[in-house]
Amino acid sequence: MTIQISQPPDSASRYLRWAAILFAIGFGIHGLDHLRRGMSASPPFVMVGGMIQGLFVVAAVVMALTQRPRAPEAAIAVGFGSAVVFTYAHLLPTFLPGYQDSFISPPHINVTWFSWFSALAEIGTGIVFAIVSMRARRSVEKASAPLLRLQPRHGVSR
């Protein structure tokens, strides 16, 4: 028995791939800003967390580009998760100094307009990645809905 998994319709799949590329670019720009600012500008927890998050970003982007069946779910989690984590880490005042690299609370080492641009680019592209993924997931569900409909058994009325 062969199980065939339906792919998202062309437009949803195409938008998901473009959103994945944009998110990868946003993540890369943010990484370049961390290199520009110097590795000592952020607490070690932020640097390690960013590297771990990078693994999730790569996985979600590769899944979207290769049209894996669970790519939309991964992209929703990684896109929204990244937006929330980076908003906390960079845009809010410092609550826990070892876990934040706040741009608005001191010491904000080497923070320039490019730092703000890179953080907002990553947050924005993360949100776009997640929203486009929600739409791609919905289109997959609509396309497979007739396949999931249960057939009535003999003698059972609906």
Please give the residue ranges for each predicted region.
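Interfacial non-cytosolic loop connecting adjacent transmembrane helices
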Residues: R37-F45, Y88-F114
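Membrane-water interface at the C-terminal end of transmembrane alpha helices
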Residues: D10-Y15, W113-S144
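Loop-to-transmembrane helix junctions at the membrane interface
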Residues: V62-L91
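Alpha-helical transmembrane segments
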Residues: R14-G28
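Short, highly charged, low-complexity non-transmembrane loops/tails of multi-pass membrane proteins
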Residues: E141-R158
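Transmembrane alpha-helix entry/boundary detector in multi-pass membrane proteins
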Residues: H30-F56
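Alpha-helical transmembrane segments in multipass membrane proteins, preferentially the mid-helix core
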Residues: L55-T66, V128-V132
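Short, Lys/Arg-rich, polar N-terminal cytosolic tail immediately upstream
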Residues: M1-S11
